[in-house]
Amino acid sequence: MNIVILGTQWGDEGKGKIVDMLTEDVAAVVRFQGGHNAGHTLIIDGEKTILRLIPSGILREGVLCLIGNGVVLSPPALMEEIEELNAKGIPVTERLRISSACNLLLPYHVALDKAREAELGTKAIGTTGRGIGPAYEDKVARRGIRAMDLLHPDQLLEKIKKATAYHNIQLEHYYHQTPLDYQSIYNQLMEFREKIKPMIGDVSALLGNLRRQNKHIIFEGAQGSLLDIDLGTYPYVTSSNTTAGSAATGSGFGPLYFDRVLGITKAYVTRVGAGPFPTELTNEEGKKMAKRGNEFGSVTGRPRRCGWFDVISMRRTIQINSLTGIVLTKLDVLDEFAKIHLCTAYRCDGEVVNEPPFDQSLLESCEPVYEEMPGWQTSTYGLTDYSEMPKEARNYISRLEELLGVPITIISTGPDRKHTIVRQAVFNQVITAKG
């Protein structure tokens, strides 16, 4: 069985934990888009691990981890992550494979990203400043440096020389930044070359072989669907396609071979950086939500904006991803709220609507229409049995399923992989739950 697991909001939904939990039964986990701007936090027996590029399956012995062609790969970030895992006694290089078609993220991408955000000032998009957007620009413009170029040092030098000269024009003459030295960039890449070279291969072929052997494969998304470059809240989006279609194009795996698409969603909503957020809470409730959820970015440390669950945006996410199941995370964050609110419609220009406005600029002025439900005001932290869930919490989950039309198959009640209620088996899960 081949399953896509992705975020349904603006990222930070808890995908890493769910992927890690499900990898007990899989042969491989694939990253298919994004770069080291994504942080997947895993907590196992109290020990925290943050992964940015390497798939979450790396913490399971014997699971093959693949980085697909849709990822933009920073060599120094990758090596730093490998070293961090090795220091914890986790071997990486034997189980990690990188698509030869994967584009590399280089110093001029980072320099451009930071210069552009500084130029925009108060109108900045709110990128992580890690060069993701400029790296994807080079890919589309066909001047990108790919992993396979590391196999041909002479050609690599010429490509870097040309790309650096091109970007230096912007850096020096438009942004008034110090130009970069192509030789230094090349020398740095050559330092990483010998370590990365053995991991470069044909990821599409590997996936094809696993499929023919009827092995289970997870395709692990980064960020969230509302940050998709085409379908998200543009221009406040990331630079890759974060939706289910990207699992095929970003890995070289045929779309008809996917069996399920699981969408990860928090029991509330968060967002980092600028952009419309209809259910955002800027009051004490929002602060309480952020504090209880420890809502700070795992990569940037930036505080996340918090708000009530948005049924309207979630329905759109279900449609564009063809979700077959929903994983509800961080339910325990709502334990102390006397009242729970669900946004079931928007009020835009005085009119109540049940779909996001096609004109994204109108979303900024849309107000949420709420349905109120009683809270449970008792701890759900660490529960593993659905029958032990407070009645009000079960009612909340049932109402979500009714409004969304998709079953909630897994509920996360805490950060550890064991803090989980599995209502419907994904593969052959050993963990089971009543309800």
Curated annotation (Swiss-Prot):
GO biological process: 'de novo' AMP biosynthetic process; IMP metabolic process
Cofactor(s) required, per the database record: Mg(2+)
EC number: 6.3.4.4
Catalytic activity as recorded in UniProt: IMP + L-aspartate + GTP = N(6)-(1,2-dicarboxyethyl)-AMP + GDP + phosphate + 2 H(+)
Binding site for Mg(2+): 12, 39
Catalytic residues, chain numbering: 12 (proton acceptor), 40 (proton donor)
Subcellular location: Cytoplasm
Binding annotation for substrate: 298-304
Gene Ontology, cellular component aspect: cytoplasm
UniProt KW Kinase keyword: no
Residues given in the record as IMP binding sites: 12-15, 37-40, 128, 142, 223, 238, 302
EC class of the enzyme, as a word: ligase
HAMAP family the record matches: Adenylosucc_synth
Subunit structure: Homodimer.
Function (record text): Plays an important role in the de novo pathway of purine nucleotide biosynthesis. Catalyzes the first committed step in the biosynthesis of AMP from IMP.
Entry's family note: Belongs to the adenylosuccinate synthetase family.
Name of this chain's protein: Adenylosuccinate synthetase
Organism: Coxiella burnetii (strain CbuG_Q212) (Coxiella burnetii (strain Q212))
